Regions:
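Secretory targeting signatures
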Residues: 1-49, 80-82, 90, 296-328
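Proline-centered helix-kink/hinge sites
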Residues: 30, 98, 152-153, 303
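Local sequence-structure signature of Cys/Sec-based thiol-disulfide redox active-site neighborhoods
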Residues: 41-121
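Short, conserved sequence motifs used for protein processing/export or organelle targeting and
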Residues: 127-148, 154, 170-305
Length: 328
């Protein structure tokens, strides 16, 4: 056998095997793309104009005995965040809160409930700052789906996945929420710190400092990731028997939201008075955003639906043409 014939035979084997390999890759890509599409149909993107979410949060309880404290965590250790837009008259919100309870179970999460405030005759919680936090972050996405920037109930997991109303996309609302919770945060490398240098429980004045490192991770490799730090004040439980949805004790009530200037600094804040009890916590929440990318985002296990088209083109190109077969 001549060397030329050997090379020709080898090339023929490669030509026969390569389409089979491409078909296998095509099937894998199609299957995974379909699975991801089915999963993501359970929710809406919580942000518009680019990728974004919540890296996580740090939480510190501010009791009458608290005078100072510090928390430092790597981004990978930060607690996942579930944000809920609700109202004390919202009957459907009772359904969603029970579903969240069941989906979360014993998982370690920070829940933050935004109560309707603007043009609100009943609900006593929240303020203009909490409304601003919700609308500036999720208002555009909510408007795109519902025509309104504030809809009770709305539930957002990790600042990325928004669920509206009570109609499930799968077998149940609990299943939707469990899937969304298990999808997890977008991972980054870095760390954040919150320090309360002094706190006077009588004047409610808190001196604090914060730091968040510029992240590295899948969303920051090809684009500039922008971080925004927020200081939130959340009451663990607030009793309001006059709420017409009958909950009575409203949990995780957000009383104030402060957008911090930069990723490192010091400040003085007026801690909101608890509605009742002594159970207000300060939360440092880190938002991330990055410009839209041409492809499909970081959640795709392969380079997205476009890979199917690309592999198909390669496959067709490798098939012997009819003209060549007739001439041999």
């Amino acid at each position: 056998m001549t060397r030329k014939h050997s090379i020709s035979q080898y090339s023929g084997i490669v030509v026969r095997i390569t389409p089979l390999m491409l078909v296998a890759l095509l099937l894998v890509a199609s299957t995974q793309a379909a699975a991801t599409s089915e999963q993501s149909s359970m929710w809406h993107d919580a942000r518009t104009g680019g990728d974004g979410g919540v890296i996580g949060a740090l939480e510190m309880t501010l009791t009458n005995e608290t005078t100072e404290g510090e928390i430092t965590l790597d981004y990978s250790e930060m607690t996942p965040v579930i944000e809920v837009y609700t109202a004390t008259w919202c009957l459907n919100c009772v359904t969603t809160e029970h579903a969240i309870d069941e989906a979360v179970g014993d998982s370690d999460v920070i829940r933050i409930h935004y109560h309707r405030h603007r043009a609100e005759p009943e609900d006593p919680f929240g303020n203009n700052a909490t409304e601003h936090r919700w609308e500036s972050t999720y208002g555009d996405a909510s408007t795109a789906e519902t025509g309104m920037s504030r809809v009770a109930p709305s539930t957002v997991f990790d600042g990325e996945r928004m669920h509206l109303g009570t109609s499930p996309s799968s077998s149940s609302l609990v299943s939707d929420y469990s899937t969304s919770l298990n999808a997890g945060q977008t991972s980054f490398t870095g760390s954040a710190r919150l320090t309360v240098t002094s706190y006077d429980s009588e004047t409610r004045l808190m001196q604090f400092s914060w730091n968040a490192s510029q992240p590295s991770g899948p969303e920051s490799e090809d684009s500039t990731t922008i971080l925004t730090a927020w200081l939130l004040f959340v009451e663990d439980s607030a009793s309001f028997p006059d709420g017409s949805n009958g909950i009575g004790d409203y949990l995780h009530v957000l009383h104030d939201a402060i957008e911090l200037d930069g990723l490192d600094g010091t400040g003085l804040a007026q801690v909101p008075t608890a509605w009742d009890g002594d159970d207000v916590s300060v939360v440092l929440l880190i938002d991330w955003t990055s410009p839209s990318m041409d492809c499909c985002g970081s959640n795709w296990p392969l380079p997205g639906p476009g890979i199917v088209t690309t592999l198909t083109c390669f496959l067709v190109a490798l098939l012997p043409s009819r003209r060549k077969r007739l001439s041999t």
